[in-house]
């Protein structure tokens, strides 16, 4: 039962963040460790915290896109019974790099804590070049290192 729950949680987050990527010009990093601070200049930064909350930093290129994305995230969290916290917080980073950001925290609680925290992995989406910086931030992950090497060869 825990395995099914974990699979569902992973699928939900994968689908949610994958869809979110369509609103931005960036891609997604896959991680199973906390990334310090959602400070990616462009892209999506996702991290699973020790308390089974998931931090997602999404950068989009207009405030209207940010509003649309925010509504969509609220619907997704409701449908999949995930708690979306701090979802109304807009991070205006337009002065720095011309993008607007949303900081959202999803809470996915494990029903049986003896199995440890859930690991949420997110697929990398295109365009590739926009996510290289994000991948480099997460290079401690062996999977990220391998993907980065593949994409560098393709570029």
Question: For the regions a protein language model found, what residue spans apply to each?
Answer:
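Charge-rich, low-complexity segments
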Residues: 1-50
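Long beta-strand-rich cores associated with HINT superfamily self-processing modules
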Residues: 41-155
